[in-house]
């Protein structure tokens, strides 16, 4: 069954720039009623909202400054968004970083932000609490399906997002909240441009850059187009990949009992 984006209210964390901004733009282009952008960067956030307003109309996008690693502030801001927009239909937990040097920040943002954002979405949208249900999209990465040894903490954080989402989707019948996971491949964003500077000192940054240069890069628009399709077509619990500037595809995890090996 096709999920209609038209007239839906949306929250995007980390939406001031990069892929998050493109999510907001593409959803508005597909008829979303309004998009709330949460981001730590106030000036870029305000600029992004102004640009979206010029393209789609006044009040189609609203900016809320928020550090999603601050659990108290995040909850307060989420409540403010809910009250300002008179509810939410879609929550995209996109805020993240790629910084293995500051591994505590990476875990707080990539893991903690997604977990709290998901729990807040279920608390407010969940049918078990009087809500009408909705959709959560958690942003993982293709590294959540494999490994990238140069960025150990980033990989671990995205594997966490994947496992968390796969657990949470089991409560759809009770909450009415669909849980989807998007796994972008290598995408042209500021995070990728600085990854060589964010690795641990035992990792050769030149080798990291050499590997990145050898891989196909996709524009942020390709991931955003995939996001629209995921929200429209994705069944609860589905995991989609958007990479190599190609159309998205879904993946399934095998049953471990079917791939066990003798030892």
Report each predicted region and the residues it spans:
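Active-site-adjacent segment of SDR/Rossmann-fold oxidoreductases
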Residues: 30, 125, 129, 146, ...
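Substrate-binding pocket helix/loop in short-chain dehydrogenase/reductase
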Residues: 102-107
